[in-house]
Structures are given as structure tokens and as C-alpha cells.
Amino acid sequence: MDGIKYAVFTEKSLRLLGKNQYTFNVESGFTKTEIKHWVELFFGVKVVAVNSHRLPGKGRRMGPILGHTMHYRRMIITLQPGYSIPLLDREKN
């Protein structure tokens, strides 16, 4: 699916891995329900909650022209106890 861009590994997201919460950057047009359904289907896990916030784009200057990068949405997905996403668990250790 093209909706999820990549997993995020910041200090906060690594701390949230201990609480069984995973952080992803997704396309800004997707809703919480769509991402929840896709994560449950693709990873075979049970999602308890989905929190999201929209990150602003950054300004970029190329000579006299001022441009910007696109904004995106970050989703924090909480899984039911006993479930995990195996590819991201290696980052916990």
C-alpha cells in the first residue's frame, strides 16, 4: 500500500515501542480508519488506538524562488497486548 511511507525512529518513537506503540509517517490524505484497517490486514495484529498529527512542510529556497516541501501525517498506532510488529521489534533492543 502506498499510504504508509515509512516507520519513524526518533527518541520518542523508540520510547513508545516499550508501550507497544508504533510510529509511521503516512500520506496526508489517509484517515485513521483506513490506516487501522491496513495495519491490521497487512501485519496481522489487533489495533487498539490510532493517534495522528499533521506535520507542516518546510520552506526551501532555490535561489530567488521560495518553495516548500509537502506536509505529511504521523500516526502513532497502539497494539493490543500480546501483539507486535516483528520487523520493528529489532529496534527495541
Curated annotation (Swiss-Prot):
Gene3D superfamilies hit by this protein: 3.30.70.330
Gene Ontology CC terms, in alphabetical order: chloroplast; cytosolic large ribosomal subunit; plastid
GO biological process: translation
Keyword flag RNA-binding: yes
Pfam families per the UniProt record, alphabetical: Ribosomal_L23
Major place of residence: plastid
Keywords annotated in UniProt: Chloroplast, Plastid, Ribonucleoprotein, Ribosomal protein, RNA-binding, rRNA-binding
Quaternary structure and partners: Part of the 50S ribosomal subunit.
Protein purpose: Binds to 23S rRNA.
Annotated HAMAP family: Ribosomal_uL23_B
Family under the similarity heading: Belongs to the universal ribosomal protein uL23 family.
Name by which UniProt lists this protein: Large ribosomal subunit protein uL23cz/uL23cy
